[in-house]
Regions:
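Conserved alpha/beta cores of soluble small-molecule-handling proteins
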Residues: 1-107
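Single conserved hydrophobic/aromatic residue that forms the stacking wall/gate
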Residues: 105-116
Length: 116
């Protein structure tokens, strides 16, 4: 049976144990993109096409480019192993965010400026 895992900011963990920062623009404003890759018998299907579309979409949205294939392949292989999909079928979701930002709420009091 496969296990839902996540890799966020350089750390592996279960999807439930890792957290996105609350000020991440993908979380706050849906300012991000994703690709879902079919894993069949431990092999990512159409990976080059998914990664090209991921990169093209980031450029279209004016975002920084996501990591390239040579940086992602070891992580993808590690994810397949960790989620026990080496001889199984499943899905891998790649998310890319514009990053963190601060929503400022101002009033007359300078003390009332908050980053959420």
């Amino acid at each position: 049976m496969s296990t839902a895992i996540a890799w966020i900011e350089g750390q592996w963990g279960t999807a439930a144990s890792l957290q996105l920062p609350l000020n991440d623009r993908a979380l706050l404003l849906a300012d991000g993109l994703f690709e879902t890759v079919l894993i069949r018998n431990g092999a990512p299907q159409l990976l080059q096409e998914h990664l090209q579309r991921w990169s093209d979409s980031a450029a279209l949205l004016g975002m920084d480019p996501p990591p390239q294939r040579d940086a992602l392949e070891p992580l993808i292989e590690d994810a397949i192993q960790r989620s026990q999909l080496s001889e199984a079928d499943g899905a891998l979701r790649l998310n890319w965010s514009r990053g963190s930002s601060c929503l400022l709420y101002t009033s007359d009091a300078a003390d009332d400026i908050r980053c959420v």
